[in-house]
């Protein structure tokens, strides 16, 4: 049932129902789904507008890359359509929509491994929704995180125990502070050794400058986490290394271009 809600200064809007986009990766040769990637697009801190078409397109591009890479294992990807693009403080609607998407994926596909892949605000939603026991891995690209405030509760990380977690952040990101994602990774690593973080030097929030390398890194992590494919050496090293080495791993130009990677 639709209802009305007041969001900040954006005025009154009609809420939407979250949904999964069309599956990416399904073909006649795939007889069974072996794993699911749920892609969570970027958004805005405060907004009453609907989901961003541009952010959806960026997530869809990565979803296609991941589905192609995991075709033999029956990997399918869905881009999650939020009810709106705003986080809107304690409302945190995208995180709730991400949690709904996990439940929906389990309903559709049963007990298969699930990876949440988010960018910006979607990365924060992915990290939050990883509390669902059905989630096996989280890939957070340029996560939008709140500034640390002694008066506020820090972003939760304990629920990430038992999940593989990869954070990727451009060092020149002017929209989301890379140091905040480092601090979150540092806290998460204290209780979960399966956390690593890569820095994309000189790249910005959209991670366009090294898009091919970022997509290759994403595919390596997702397939290694969901289907036990061997990780590329840099990913394995980052997971094994203690802080700060494993949390400030540089993403090398040309990552993924070697044969077989």
Task: List PLM regions with ranges.
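Short alpha-helix in the alpha/beta-hydrolase fold that links the catalytic acid
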Residues: 153, 177-187
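Short, surface-exposed "cap/lid" segments of acyl-processing enzymes
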Residues: 4-72
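Short beta-strand/loop motif that positions the catalytic acidic residue
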Residues: 160-162, 166-173
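C-terminal catalytic histidine-bearing segment of alpha/beta-hydrolase fold enzymes
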Residues: 182, 193-261
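Active-site nucleophile loop of the alpha/beta-hydrolase fold
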Residues: 140-147, 203
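Alpha/beta-hydrolase active-site loop
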Residues: 88-108
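Acidic catalytic loop of the alpha/beta-hydrolase fold
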Residues: 146-147, 171-177
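Gly/Ala-rich beta-loop-alpha elbow adjacent to hydrolase catalytic centers
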Residues: 117-126
């Amino acid at each position: 049932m639709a209802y009305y809600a007041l969001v900040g200064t954006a005025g009154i809007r009609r809420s939407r129902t979250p949904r999964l986009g069309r599956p990416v990766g399904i073909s006649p040769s795939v007889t069974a789904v072996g794993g699911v990637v749920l892609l969570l697009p970027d958004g805005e801190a405060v907004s009453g507008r609907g989901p961003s078409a541009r952010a959806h397109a960026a997530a869809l591009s990565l979803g296609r890359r991941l589905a192609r890479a995991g075709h033999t294992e029956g990997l399918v990807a869905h881009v999650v359509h939020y009810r709106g693009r705003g986080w809107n403080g304690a409302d945190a609607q995208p995180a709730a929509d991400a949690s709904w998407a996990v439940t929906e994926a389990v309903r559709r596909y049963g007990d298969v491994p699930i990876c949440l892949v988010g960018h910006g605000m979607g990365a924060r939603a992915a990290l939050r929704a990883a509390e669902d026991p059905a989630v096996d891995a989280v890939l957070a690209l340029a996560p939008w995180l709140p500034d640390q405030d002694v008066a506020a509760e820090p972003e939760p990380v304990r629920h990430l125990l038992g999940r593989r977690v990869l954070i990727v952040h451009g060092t020149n990101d002017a929209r989301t502070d890379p140091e905040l994602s480092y601090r979150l990774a540092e806290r998460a690593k204290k209780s979960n050794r399966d956390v690593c973080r890569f820095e994309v030097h000189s790249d910005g929030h959209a991670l366009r400058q090294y898009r091919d390398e970022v997509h290759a890194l994403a595919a390596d992590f997702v397939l290694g986490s969901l289907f036990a494919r061997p990780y590329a050496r840099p990913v394995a090293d980052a997971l094994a290394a203690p802080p700060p080495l494993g949390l400030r791993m540089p993403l090398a130009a040309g990552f993924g271009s070697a044969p077989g990677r």
